[in-house]
Design a protein with these regions (language model features):
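Dinucleotide-binding Rossmann-like beta1-alpha1 core, especially the glycine-rich loop
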Residues: 42-118, 122, 128, 249-250, ...
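Beta1/beta-strand and adjacent pyrophosphate-binding region of the FAD-binding site
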Residues: 1-6, 24
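Helical element adjacent to the flavin cofactor pocket in flavoenzyme catalytic cores
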Residues: 132-191, 195-196, 202, 377-390
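C-terminal catalytic lobe of FAD-dependent flavoproteins
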Residues: 297-396
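Short beta-strand to alpha-helix junction loop
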Residues: 51-62, 86-95, 132-151, 163, ...
Length: 396
C-alpha cells in the first residue's frame, strides 16, 4: 500500500524474491510517486551524515549502489556528479569535522576535506572557508525510477496488479486473510505491507497498530535560478547542517533536466499533502494541533520555526540565506519554484524520530518512518522488507 519509491521498490524486490507471488500495489493518486518521491530534491545521497550502524546509514549506502546500477541498466536519467558541503563561518567547522568523521566511519568513497581554493575549483562562485568534497553524490529522476520498478515487477507475474486512484478506507483483519476496503471496492490479501509516507500513521492505526507517535508534515519551498544565473552552480552545493534539526539546510541542486533549484526551507504545513503556502486541511490541522508533541516541537524550536516562516514569505530573506554560499546572487537571479512536503514521525515529547522505522503487526509490515535518504535507500529498504517478509510470514 503506497506507490512512492519505497512502495515501488518493495513491490519490485518482493516480486523478484517471490516470482510466483501475486502482489497488488494500491496507490490513492492517479500517478505513482506523486507526493514525497516526486517533490524531493532528486539527490542520490552518499550516506555522509547518518549515524554509523543505523538503518539510515546501512540502507543509504547499499541503496545508493543499487540505485545507480538500476539507473544504468534501465536508462533512468541520472548523473553521479558529486557535491560540496561548505562552511561559511568558523562556528561551522566543528560540525563539519564531525560530519567528515562520520563519513569516514561509514566508508563513504572518495570524500576529502578541501580548502576554500579547492572549493572554488569545483564551484567557482562559492565563497567558503573550506568544505567536504563528496564525489559519490548524484542526481536522478526518482519518478522515472519508481515507474520502472513497478513496470518490471508487473512484467514478472501476470497475477500482480497496480491499482491507481484506489484509496484504502479501512481494513478488516481475518484469521487467514485481511479485507482491504478501498474507494474502488474490497480486496482480500493474506499479507500487507504499508509504505504510506505522509499517511503512514493513519494507515497503521487502521490496521490496528497502537502507535504513540504521529506524522506531521513540513513543507519545503524551492526557488529556481534563472537561465542567465544557472552558470553560477555547476552541480550540488550544501551548507554544513545544524545537528539540532532534522533537515540538511537550504542547498543548490542541479536537476537532471538542467534546471538549478535552491531550497528547501522547512515550515509546518496545515495540509499533509499541500504544496501551496496557503493550503489548508481541517483534518490535518486538527490532528496536528491536538497532538501534544506538535506543540512541544514548536516550543523547543521557536526561533528556528519563526525564521523559517519569515523566509517562506520573503524572497529577500531566502536570497540572504543563499548568499551565504554564493554572495553574487541577486534578486533577479531567482524566481519561485515548486514545493515539497516531508513526513516527520513525531513523538509525544516533541522529538522527531530520526532513523528509519519498520515494524510488524500480525501479517502486516509497516514502514512508519522513512525520511531522507529513503528515496536513495529505497531498493535496500525493499530488499530488507522482502527478507523480513520471509521470516515474519514464512514465505517460500
Amino acid at each position: 500500500i503506497g506507490g512512492g519509491i519505497v512502495g515501488a521498490a518493495t513491490f519490485y524486490k518482493l516480486q523478484v524474491k517471490y516470482p510466483n507471488l501475486k502482489i497488488a500495489l494500491f496507490e490513492k493518486e492517479a500517478l505513482l510517486a506523486d507526493h514525497q518521491t516526486g517533490h524531493n530534491s532528486g539527490v542520490i545521497h552518499s550516506g555522509l551524515y547518518y549515524k554509523p550502524g543505523s538503518l539510515k546509514a546501512r540502507n543509504c549506502i547499499q541503496g545508493r549502489h543499487e540505485l545507480v546500477a538500476f539507473a544504468k541498466e534501465h536508462g533512468i536519467n541520472h548523473d553521479v556528479c558529486g557535491k560540496v558541503v561548505v562552511a561559511t563561518d568558523a562556528s561551522e567547522l566543528p560540525n563539519m569535522d564531525r560530519i567528515f568523521k562520520t563519513g569516514l566511519e561509514n566508508k563513504i568513497e572518495g570524500i576529502e576535506m578541501i580548502n576554500a581554493d579547492q572549493v572554488r575549483e569545483i564551484e567557482p562562485h562559492v565563497k567558503s572557508i573550506g568544505g567536504i568534497w563528496v564525489p559519490c553524490t548524484g542526481i536522478i529522476d526518482f519518478r522515472g525510477a519508481t515507474a520502472k520498478m513497478v513496470e518490471i515487477a508487473l512484467s514478472m507475474q501476470e497475477g500482480s496488479k497496480l491499482f491507481l486512484e484506489t484509496e484504502v478506507i479501512s481494513i478488516d483483519k481475518g484469521e487467514e486473510n485481511s479485507t482491504i476496503h478501498t474507494s474502488k471496492g474490497a480486496y482480500e490479501a493474506e499479507y500487507l505491507v504499508f509504505c504510506a509516507g505522509l499517511q503512514a500513521d493513519r494507515l497503521a492505526r487502521k490496521d490496528g497498530v497502537k502507535l504513540k507517535e504521529q506524522v506531521v508534515g513540513f513543507r519545503g519551498d524551492y526557488y529556481e535560478l534563472t537561465p542567465e544565473a544557472k552558470h553560477k552552480v555547476k552541480n550540488l552545493i550544501y551548507p554544513v547542517p545544524n545537528p539540532d534539526f532534522p533537515f540538511l539546510g537550504v542547498h543548490f541542486t542541479r536537476m537532471t533536466d538542467g534546471e538549478v533549484e535552491c531550497g528547501p526551507n522547512a515550515v509546518f504545513t496545515f495540509k499533509r499533502e499541500g504544496y501551496g503556502k496557503t493550503d489548508f486541511s481541517l483534518k490535518d490541522t486538527y490532528d496536528a494541533l491536538t497532538y501534544g508533541g506538535t506543540w512541544k516541537l514548536f516550543f523547543n524550536n521557536m526561533s528556528f520555526g519563526i525564521n523559517e516562516y519569515r523566509r517562506a514569505f520573503s524572497k529577500k530573506l531566502f536570497l540572504k540565506t543563499l548568499q551565504r554560499m554564493i554572495p553574487d546572487l541577486t534578486m533577479d537571479d531567482i524566481h519561485p519554484g515548486r514545493s515539497g512536503v516531508r513526513a516527520l514521525l513525531l513523538a509525544e515529547d516533541g522529538d522527531t524520530r530520526d532513523d528509519f522505522r519498520i515494524e510488524y503487526h500480525g501479517k502486516s509490515i509497516h514502514v512508519l518512518n522513512a525520511p531522507s535518504p529513503a528515496a536513495t535507500a529505497s531498493l535496500a529498504i525493499g530488499q530488507y522488507i522482502a527478507d523480513e517478509a520471509e521470516k515474519q510470514f514464512n514465505l517460500k
